[in-house]
A protein has these predicted regions:
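Cell-wall polysaccharide-cleaving catalytic domain and substrate-binding groove, primarily
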Residues: 16-170
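Classical Sec-dependent N-terminal signal peptides that target proteins to the secretory pathway
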Residues: 1-18
Length: 170
């Protein structure tokens, strides 16, 4: 019996470890665009792309704490880990990380024609995973994200960075 428990624990630990390794790749990709410095301007205050919505003391945020927030409060909390295709998972994480999560999710839900709730629920995940042409889905996600950004009043100021990010995140 003890041997079965040890085997089960080892198996579950491996799954958790593998999930974190996959996430590390996704997170590192997003940090290419976010940077690691503290930023305070008339729009926001952030560090590692983490805003005050996730951490009250953004200025003193450590890289480890930023990683934990990104993993637990964004990646896992919004079920991004349930997206099967790595490139789609990477793009969706970056979008949600860089935007108001509910707004990004609503735009994704509208695009894939599921009930718009603002929550990355099983219906949304299933529709994403069942999308037959991954390249087309990524193209449509990029187009939808860029079209949304064009509606923002700060678009002209940040458009070059935003366009570059969307074109190169996956």
């Amino acid at each position: 019996m003890l041997k079965k428990i040890v085997i089960l624990f080892t198996f579950l630990s491996t799954i958790s470890f593998s999930t974190e390794i996959m996430f590390q790749k996704i997170y590192s990709n997003t940090l290419r665009f976010e940077g690691k410095t503290y930023i305070k301007n008339n729009i926001e205050e952030s560090k590692y792309g983490i805003s005050k919505a996730y951490s009250k003391d953004v200025k003193n945020l450590t890289e480890k704490k930023a990683f934990d927030i990104a993993y637990n409060k964004i990646y896992k909390a919004h079920n991004i880990d349930k997206i099967e295709n790595e490139k789609v998972r990477m793009f969706v994480f970056d979008w949600i990380y860089n935007s108001a999560p509910r707004g990004a999710i609503k735009r994704i839900q509208k695009l894939i024609d599921v009930k718009i709730t603002g929550n990355m629920n099983i219906e949304t995940i299933t529709a994403i995973n069942d999308f037959s042409d991954t390249d087309l889905l990524i193209h449509l996600l990029k187009e939808t994200r860029l079209n949304y950004l064009k509606t923002l009043k700060h678009y002209e100021k940040y458009k070059n960075g935003w366009q570059y990010r969307i074109a190169n995140v996956v």
